[in-house]
UniProtKB/Swiss-Prot annotation:
Taxonomic lineage of the native organism: Eukaryota, Fungi, Dikarya, Ascomycota, Taphrinomycotina
Broad class of where this protein is predominantly found: cytoplasm
Region (Disordered) residue spans: 1-71, 83-113
Sorted UniProt keywords: Chaperone, Cytoplasm, Nucleus
The protein's name in its UniProt record: Histone H2A.Z-specific chaperone chz1
Localization terms from the record: Cytoplasm; Nucleus
Entry similarity comment: Belongs to the CHZ1 family.
Composition-biased stretches (Basic and acidic residues): 1-18
Organism of this sequence: Schizosaccharomyces pombe (strain 972 / ATCC 24843) (Fission yeast)
Amino acid sequence: MSEEPKKIDIKGKGRAIEDLIPDIDDEEDDVDFQDLSSSGESDDSDDSMQEDYDDIHDEEPEDYSAIDPTNIMCSTRTRRKKIDFTKVLEEGQNEDDFEEEDEDYIPPQDKTM
């Protein structure tokens, strides 16, 4: 079965507009970029690229101990103390007795004076 392209009927008025951006013939199309290099002696060899890679990766390995949740430290209330995640309140347990003190909380003042 041969597929014929479907013809689309376009209703309304339309007109073709000439391309308003003229084609500019660049005279510099055939430029040799090797001649334009400033030093003329760029070292793109695999050896130099490997040296750059090795220089970057010669640093000390990252310390991933901070990512371990058992090593998380708080900077204010529990300074230099490890957080014990085994004592976290379970949902619905002692919610009424648990109040967190807010260091920045300022109680409202009576304005009846």
